[in-house]
Amino acid sequence: MNQLEQLRQFTTVVADTGDFQLMKQYTPQDATTNPSLILKAVQKPEYRHLLEKAVQDHHGNGGVDAVMDEVLIAFGCEILAIVPGRVSTEVDARLSFDTEASVAKARHLIQLYEQRGIARERVLIKIASTWEGIRAAEILQRDGIRCNMTLLFSLVQAVACAEAGAQLISPFVGRIFDWYKKQAGEQWDAAANGGDNDPGVRSVRQIYDYYKKFGYPTEVMGASFRSTTQILSLAGCDLLTISPELLEQLAAGQGPVAHKLSVDQAQAANIARIAADEPAFRWQLNEDAMATEKLAEGIRLFAADAVKLEKLIGEIAK
C-alpha cells in the first residue's frame, strides 16, 4: 500500500487545485480552489474555453463581476463531476472586511450553483478568517450555506470560527512554516523544526486537539503544504487538502504512515479554554505577529490574483 492509500485510512484526502483533469487520477473525496489556483488554471490552453464562454455569456450582462462568478462556478461544476463530495469556492478576498458584502456574494454563488442543479450541501464557501469574515459565516451557516474558513493561522481564529458554527476550517501549514523559517534566517535548524516539531504542523495539532477536547463539530482541514513530511505528520486530521504535485509524491511513497492525530489523545490532553469574543480575538491576533502578517499578506495575494483574472477577462472581452 502506498503512502496515499495509507493516509486515506486515517484522513479524508482533498485535492487542492483548479486543474480538474489532473486531480482525476488521485480520486479525492473533495476539492478546494482559490483565486490563485483558478488564475493558474485558466492560463492553461485546455481551460481557456471556460473563461471565453463565461465572457461570451455574461460580459454584457453584469460585467466583469458576473464573468468572475461564472468562471468560479464553471470550475466548481467541472470539479463536482469528478469528486463525489464537495468543492470549495472562494468569496472575493477584497470583501474580507465587509460582512454584508461577503454574505451577499456567498448567497449569489450558491444561487448560481443551485441554478445548475448543484445542491448547496456540495459547496463550501471559502471566506477569510477575519472577524468580519467569521461573522459572515455565522449568518450563512444559519441559512444552510456551509463555510470553509481560510487564511487561518492561529488558535484564536480557529476558536472564533468554531463558536460561529463554521462547517470547516483550513489552517495553513506551509505559510506558517515559511514565516518562522524566514524569521530565523541563517539560524534556522531544519532538523529541530521538522516533522512533528514543524511550527505549521504544531499549529494544526493544537487546533485539532482543542476542537476534539471541547466537542466542536467544525471540521479541521490542514492546508498549504510544502512537503509530504508535513502531510504525514498530520495523518488523522479530519481532512487534508493537497496539491497534485504532493499527491503524486504520496502515491509513489512506500514508507509506513503512522496515525498522528486522534480524538482520544485530544480528549485526554490538558487544554485550557480561551476567549474568542471580539476584544479577545483582536488582541490575541494582534499579539501574534506571524498570524497578523500572514493573514494580511494572504488577503493581499488573493486580491491581487483576482485583479489579474479581471484583467484577463477584460482582454478577452475587447
From Swiss-Prot:
UniProt gene name: tal
Name listed for the protein in its UniProt record: Transaldolase
InterPro entries: Aldolase_TIM, TAL/FSA, Transaldolase_1, Transaldolase_AS
Record pathway: Carbohydrate degradation; pentose phosphate pathway; D-glyceraldehyde 3-phosphate and beta-D-fructose 6-phosphate from D-ribose 5-phosphate and D-xylulose 5-phosphate (non-oxidative stage): step 2/3
Keyword Transferase: yes
HAMAP family to which the protein is assigned, alphabetical: Transaldolase_1
MF term (GO), any: transaldolase activity
Family assignment from sequence similarity: Belongs to the transaldolase family. Type 1 subfamily.
Gene Ontology biological-process entries: carbohydrate metabolic process; pentose-phosphate shunt
Localization, UniProt: Cytoplasm
